[in-house]
Regions:
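Short, solvent-exposed loop/beta-turn-alpha elements that line the ligand-binding surface or hinge
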Residues: 4, 50-72, 123-125, 135-144
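Extracytoplasmic/periplasmic solute-binding protein
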Residues: 10-62, 78, 107
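Alpha-to-beta junction loops
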Residues: 23-26, 104-113, 129
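Bilobed periplasmic-binding protein-like "clamshell/Venus-flytrap" ligand-binding domains
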Residues: 21-34, 176-185, 288-295
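Short helix-initiation/N-cap motifs at beta->coil->alpha
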Residues: 7-14, 89-103
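C-terminal lobe and pocket-closing loops
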Residues: 120-127, 141-146, 150-259
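Beta->alpha turn/N-cap motifs
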Residues: 95, 112-120, 150
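Glycine-centered hinge/linker elements that transmit conformational signals in sensory
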Residues: 13-18, 59-91, 132, 136
Length: 295
């Protein structure tokens, strides 16, 4: 049968605990260094109702996350660590180690995107049919998922020649709202190369910003010819009906992530971590040392 996936963060905690108790494998893991912990944590925090920053009428930015919602989200992490004990032994890890924890079967669940699926299979030797993708668990304020990471943008100060080159590169990737014969050829070549390397080709795009039905039809026809995984393992993930897709915070994201990393590490490594103090100092730090210094 198909795996039973957690619909809420509370269910994730409970399922992760059961997995660890029955198998000895950590039920869940998150990164905690190099700004990756804060980056991943945004999804959890938003679902608890946290907003991190806000632009004031005078144009200045204000840290607004010294709130009960932020404390509740941190408490959830604390409970995962100290109440449910679901994490692997190594809890201070970067993004590379984070992926490794999963593909070496040291953790059953992680937060990642389908663009990492091929790497997980080719690097770690996992059976591609043993990977199941599900949408983000729901929190008290809803179900949030961060967009970004694979976005392509044009620099406003580009020359016309640079913009032309960028468009040609996007066409080479097939990252366009239309599919020409040349783009179709490139997509097919990419699929063949992925399969040759042992990676994953999905039967359809799992997430697309393009609304063109013609493009969708052509893409699904191409991918359908090369697909090498069971689409049922990804159907839950593809149901966006109740998912709020949200971009990263507007300004100084990396500085915010670094501060959140430190908070998460404190929670992971210290049972007597003071949630109230951590929340207050994190917001003050972000305001005083970063937002207030913006030009």
């Amino acid at each position: 049968g198909m795996p039973k996936v957690p619909n809420t963060w509370q269910e994730l905690a409970e399922y992760a605990k059961i997995i660890k108790e029955k198998t000895g494998i950590a039920g869940f893991s998150i990164p905690t260094t190099n700004n990756c912990g804060g980056w991943i944590f945004l999804n959890i925090a938003w679902s608890y109702g946290v907003n991190f920053e806000e632009q004031q009428a005078n144009g200045k930015w204000k840290a607004i996350f010294d709130t009960q919602e932020f404390r509740d989200a941190l408490q959830f992490l604390y409970d995962l660590r100290w109440k449910y004990d679901v994490f692997p032994d190594n809890k201070v890890i970067d993004a590379t180690e984070y992926q490794k924890v999963f593909y070496t079967k040291q953790a059953a669940m992680i937060i990642t995107g389908p663009d990492n699926a091929s790497g997980i299979v080719t690097q770690g030797g996992l059976n591609k049919d043993d990977i199941f993708f599900a949408k983000m668990p729901k929190g008290p304020a809803g179900r949030y998922s961060q967009m970004g990471g694979a976005a392509r943008v044009f620099f406003s100060k580009n020359s016309e020649e640079q913009n032309d080159a960028a468009v040609k590169w996007l066409m080479e990737e097939g990252y366009t709202p239309f599919i020409t014969p040349e783009i179709e050829k490139n997509i097919r070549t990419n699929c063949e190369n992925t399969i040759e390397k042992g990676g994953i080709v999905f039967p359809k795009e799992l997430f697309s910003q393009w609304e063109s039905e013609d493009r969708k039809t052509k893409i699904e026809k191409i991918y359908g010819e090369y697909a090498n995984v069971d689409i049922r393992n990804y159907e839950n993930y593809m149901d966006f009906s109740d998912v709020i897709i949200r971009p990263e915070e507007p300004v100084l994201c990396q500085q915010l992530y670094s501060i959140l990393d430190n908070v998460i590490q404190e929670i992971m490594t210290k049972k007597d971590a003071d949630i109230d103090a951590l929340a207050k100092s994190a917001a003050e730090n972000f305001q005083k040392n970063h937002l207030d210094k913006m030009e």
